[in-house]
Amino acid sequence: MNCPFCSHFESKVVDSRPTDEGQAIRRRRECVSCHKRFTTYEKIEEIPLIVVKKSGNRESFNRNKVLNGMIRACEKRPVPLNKIEAIVDHIEKQLYNSMEKEITTEFIGTLVIDQIKQLDEVAYVRFASVYREFKDINTFMDELKKLLKEKPEEA
């Protein structure tokens, strides 16, 4: 880091401490040439995730939309909110770890549907009916038949 006073390229760190609830590090530096001190902040670069909608429109990823969709699907079901939030955290982590700058709504929906299926079957059918845009009762029944076929026999 160049010194802001003399532009020398070398400095030494005199003090480091976390700030902003651990999201950044504040460093006191001293220039090895002019011996003046200055402060720098180091924080993780956040890459914004862009969601590509079915219409082709693009918008920033909003985890609350995923959370609200799952809460709506789980309404009046015995699913604790902390489980839903943990799934949304997991999905968000998967999206950021994908290293893609643009994510389709279809990809997000697939991640949600895979997770919600393991959580609650009724919530899964509710979410799938919206996500897969069931047009009529036959489409709905086909999805139920698939779900029943996948379900292991109970003794």
Swiss-Prot record:
The keyword Acetylation is annotated on this UniProt entry: no
InterPro entries: ATP-cone_dom, NrdR-like_N, RNR_NrdR-like
Gene Ontology BP terms: negative regulation of DNA-templated transcription
Cofactor comment text: Binds 1 zinc ion.
Disulfide bonds listed in the record: none
PROSITE patterns linked to this entry: ATP_CONE (PS51161)
Entry annotated with the keyword Oxidoreductase: no
Gene Ontology molecular function, alphabetical: ATP binding; DNA binding; zinc ion binding
Residues making up the signal peptide according to the UniProt record: none
ZnF region ranges: unnamed: 3-34
Cofactor: Zn(2+)
The entry's keywords: ATP-binding, DNA-binding, Metal-binding, Nucleotide-binding, Repressor, Transcription, Transcription regulation, Zinc, Zinc-finger
Residue ranges of coiled coil: none
Transmembrane annotation, as ranges: none
Domain (ATP-cone) ranges: 49-139
Job of this protein: Negatively regulates transcription of bacterial ribonucleotide reductase nrd genes and operons by binding to NrdR-boxes.
Family: Belongs to the NrdR family.
Protein name: Transcriptional repressor NrdR
Gene name linked to the record: nrdR
